[in-house]
């Protein structure tokens, strides 16, 4: 597999270590990591899938407007939801517990909005995807909740849990992309890059 499209550099509009690791799995190392500073507050009555799609687009377009050189910008946003109830990105152990109490024993969805922009001089070509994965957590005991909250790995994670960490042991059912739950759906990422002429298998 080779990468082409005028050797345009990849810019990842995220400081997520998980997304960097996922890109490495498909043999991509970003030339730059530029986090997009945007307001991630959901709009009134905004659905989880619309929120993830909108935020990914806003991240990608913000970086595209900031850079002068040609590049391919990859942006994503992950949202965990129970029905239409959007769970926060946990900022404390208390919020981690709040999220896990909601998810305990319940089937829920993780949405990742993906937006890839190819900026070549003043021309922008955009690819957008929204991917959902259905999960069910086991019913968590108080001891399990206490233990997980003590790990701090759910801090700054959508829905208060790091699916590639200990929280993976809570999953009793999953349907859909695992990489999507980690923060970047690889199937859709590769297909989008391929449609932009970035990937060649020759």
Swiss-Prot record:
It catalyses: a ribonucleoside 5'-triphosphate + H2O = a ribonucleoside 5'-phosphate + diphosphate + H(+); a 2'-deoxyribonucleoside 5'-triphosphate + H2O = a 2'-deoxyribonucleoside 5'-phosphate + diphosphate + H(+). Its EC number is 3.6.1.9. Keywords: Cytoplasm, Hydrolase, Nucleotide metabolism. It is found in: Cytoplasm. Its main location: cytoplasm. Pfam families: Maf. The keyword Cytoplasm applies. The active site is at 77 (proton acceptor). SUPFAM superfamilies: ITPase-like. GO terms for molecular function: nucleoside triphosphate diphosphatase activity. This is Nucleoside triphosphate pyrophosphatase. It comes from Rickettsia bellii (strain OSU 85-389). The lineage of its organism: Bacteria, Pseudomonadati, Pseudomonadota, Alphaproteobacteria, Rickettsiales.
């Amino acid at each position: 597999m080779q990468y082409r499209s005028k050797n345009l550099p990849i810019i990842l509009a995220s400081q997520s270590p998980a997304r960097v690791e996922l890109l490495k799995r498909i043999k991509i190392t970003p030339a730059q990591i530029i986090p997009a500073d945007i307001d991630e507050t959901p709009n009134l009555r905004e659905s989880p899938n619309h929120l993830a799609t909108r935020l990914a687009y806003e991240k990608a377009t913000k970086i595209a407007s900031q850079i002068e050189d040609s590049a391919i910008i990859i942006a994503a946003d992950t949202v965990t939801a129970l029905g239409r109830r959007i769970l926060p990105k946990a900022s404390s152990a208390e919020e981690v517990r709040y999220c896990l109490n909601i998810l305990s024993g319940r089937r829920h969805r993780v949405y990742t909005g993906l937006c890839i922009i190819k900026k070549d001089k003043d021309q922008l070509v955009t690819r957008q995807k929204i991917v959902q994965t259905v999960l069910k957590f086991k019913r968590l005991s108080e001891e399990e909740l206490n233990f997980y909250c003590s790990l701090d790995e759910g801090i700054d994670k959508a829905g208060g849990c790091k699916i590639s960490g200990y929280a993976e042991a809570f999953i009793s059912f999953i349907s859909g992309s695992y990489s999507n739950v980690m923060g970047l759906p690889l199937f859709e990422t590769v297909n989008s890059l391929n449609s932009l002429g970035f990937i060649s298998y020759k």
